[in-house]
């Protein structure tokens, strides 16, 4: 029996995928796996029983990745599950920034008691006129699941699309429209594009990547959209530029005292993935990742360990071992198994940065004695008898 804990409400359509071999517990200290959305985990005490954390969403800034890795806890996310919901809101942001829709709505509310509002509106509507997005240049920074959807949809809406991502995956490249112009220098996007939308993860290398220097390169009519992470933009520099009329609008999905109410800022309360479909998709993917790891030892969509999969186990036993990515590990655990008289029927070893993971299928049942001997190898973080 596996036990799981939900640190946030998780859509029932996902939780319903757990079989009868899983039990929901209210205490994280009793859990083998945890599902989380936005709950902060950095200060939580992580129990030794915890094997996996699945983030029902893409961002993992609320999860202590290094701490989890050191304790042999695999952290998963659900890339692409909420991509369409975010994509749609990006285009809503473009339209709100291009045409004063909000101003027009506010005007109607302020004049709701005017019996002649229809006639008055015809005279006032020029105050809320804007521009169309068709024919404009859109720069997409980051061509992951969301960025690719935004770029492709913009092509169909008649925009001239420029894409920048030096680390684009093979899958994303295959899915990207051939009409998207590939840019090798992000500064070209800053200088040339009417709309700039950011879709990169928050890393040390991307923190405040849109800074005062980048903003200074932009057109005075530029509109910047941020539906990724607020810390990707130096928002104090952005607000100063907006106040000075150096760019037109900043659209953000991350409200804070700096941007809310500031001139030229359109801010929404983190609505990007707040659709029933996105929440369902994230929950479904998160539960499937947990089940595949708990039942088969397979890692798919981990952010702190390498992806590693051998399908379902068809031999007498399977061992999963998380360890440091150092030389000599393969020979040590191969020798340990050989000394125990166990034949390796199949094995896959993958590494990612400082950490690695190995799945080993064996032709005889896995004993606790063998598990203990593997745990005693220097550099091993966690060993698990999968079958």
Predicted regions and their residues:
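An N-terminal-biased, well-structured beta-alpha scaffold segment characteristic
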Residues: 1-78, 211-213, 217, 223, ...
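Hydrophobic Val/Ile/Leu positions in short beta-strands of Rossmann-like dinucleotide-binding domains
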Residues: 4-6, 140, 321
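Rossmann-like adenosine-cofactor binding region
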Residues: 39-44, 166-259, 274
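Phosphate-binding beta-alpha-beta segment of Rossmann-like dinucleotide-binding domains, i.e.
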Residues: 79-137, 298-303
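Oxidoreductase and adenylate-handling cofactor-binding alpha/beta cores
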Residues: 87-106, 152-159, 285-298, 334-338
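Glycine-rich Rossmann-fold phosphate-binding loop(s) that bind the pyrophosphate
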Residues: 136, 143-144
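N-terminal Rossmann-fold NAD(P) dinucleotide-binding loop
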Residues: 147-148
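NAD(P)-dependent dehydrogenase/reductase Rossmann-like domain
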Residues: 250, 260-263, 271-387
């Amino acid at each position: 029996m596996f036990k799981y804990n939900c640190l946030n409400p998780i859509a029932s359509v996902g939780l319903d995928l757990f079989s009868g071999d899983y039990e929901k517990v209210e205490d994280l200290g009793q859990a083998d796996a945890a599902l989380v959305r936005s709950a902060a985990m950095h200060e939580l005490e992580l129990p030794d029983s915890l094997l996996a954390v699945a983030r029902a969403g893409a961002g993992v800034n609320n999860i202590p990745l290094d701490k989890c890795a050191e304790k042999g806890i695999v952290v998963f996310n659900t890339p692409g599950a909420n991509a369409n919901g975010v994509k749609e809101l990006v285009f809503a942001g473009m339209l709100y920034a291009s045409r004063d829709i909000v101003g027009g709505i506010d005007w109607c509310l302020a004049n709701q008691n005017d019996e002649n509002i229809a006639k008055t509106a015809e005279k006032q509507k020029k105050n809320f006129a804007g521009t169309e997005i068709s024919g404009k240049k859109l720069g997409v920074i980051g061509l992951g699941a969301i960025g690719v959807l935004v770029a492709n949809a913009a092509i169909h809406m008649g925009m001239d699309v420029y894409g920048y991502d030096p680390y684009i995956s093979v899958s994303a490249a295959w899915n990207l429209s051939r009409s998207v112009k590939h840019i090798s220098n992000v500064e070209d996007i800053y200088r040339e594009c009417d709309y700039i939308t950011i879709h990169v993860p928050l890393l040390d290398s991307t923190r405040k990547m849109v800074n005062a220097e980048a903003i200074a390169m932009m057109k005075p009519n530029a509109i910047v959209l941020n539906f990724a992470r607020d810390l990707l933009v130096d928002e104090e520099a952005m607000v100063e530029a907006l106040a000075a009329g150096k760019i037109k609008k900043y659209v953000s999905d991350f409200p804070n005292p700096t941007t809310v109410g500031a001139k030229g800022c359109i801010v929404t309360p983190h609505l990007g993935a707040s659709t029933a479909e996105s929440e369902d998709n994230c929950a479904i993917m998160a539960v499937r990742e947990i089940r595949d790891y708990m039942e088969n030892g397979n890692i798919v969509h981990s952010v702190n360990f390498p992806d590693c999969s051998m399908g379902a186990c068809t031999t007498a036993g399977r061992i999963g071992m998380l360890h440091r990515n150092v030389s000599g590990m393969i020979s040590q655990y191969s020798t340990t198994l050989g000394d125990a008289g166990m034949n390796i029927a199949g094995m896959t070893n993958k590494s990612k940065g400082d950490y690695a993971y190995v799945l080993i299928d064996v032709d005889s049942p896995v004993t606790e004695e063998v598990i203990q001997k593997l745990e005693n190898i220097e550099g091993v973080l966690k060993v698990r008898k999968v079958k």
